[in-house]
């Protein structure tokens, strides 16, 4: 995963893309999060590389769309707070290593996009990342109930 600014590709990210020479680049986030100019710049520095946006109206929807784009089903899923990024970012590495999607939720209620993604993916296990101030115990229990692991 490489990071960018909303309206400009940082030099370090540009160097990493040149070094990695991927055949496909996925840009996560809607137009407000990552503007079209950034996608165009990726196309300029990597001619012939496919550049695809996976966007949505908000971060919760983007996480669901990423799960839909890359997983038709999954044995497990990881859930993190959509309000702060550290838990989702660090949990994402572990989830990715296991081949699991990361969904985002609200602290005190299951985000509808996360609940919908779980119904579609039909995992048998959900791992909640972060403490109860990030994702309440109640929300953790609701996720467990959604996958029959209550």
Locations of regions flagged by a protein language model:
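Extracellular glycan-binding segments that recognize GlcNAc-based cell-wall polysaccharides
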Residues: 1-150
């Amino acid at each position: 995963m490489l990071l960018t600014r909303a309206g400009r590709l940082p030099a370090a990210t540009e160097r990493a893309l040149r070094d990695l020479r991927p055949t496909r680049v996925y840009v996560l986030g809607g137009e407000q999060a990552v503007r079209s100019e950034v996608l165009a710049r990726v196309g300029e520095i990597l001619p012939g590389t496919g550049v695809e946006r996976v966007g949505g109206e908000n971060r919760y929807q983007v996480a669901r769309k990423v799960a839909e784009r890359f997983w038709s089903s999954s044995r497990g899923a990881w859930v993190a707070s959509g309000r702060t990024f550290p838990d989702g970012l660090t949990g994402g590495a572990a989830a990715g290593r296991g081949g699991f999607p990361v969904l985002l939720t609200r602290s005190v209620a299951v985000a509808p996009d996360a609940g919908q993604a779980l119904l579609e993916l039909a995992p048998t296990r959900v791992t909640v990342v972060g403490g109860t101030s990030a994702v309440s115990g109640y929300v953790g229990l609701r996720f467990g109930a959604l996958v029959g692991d209550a």
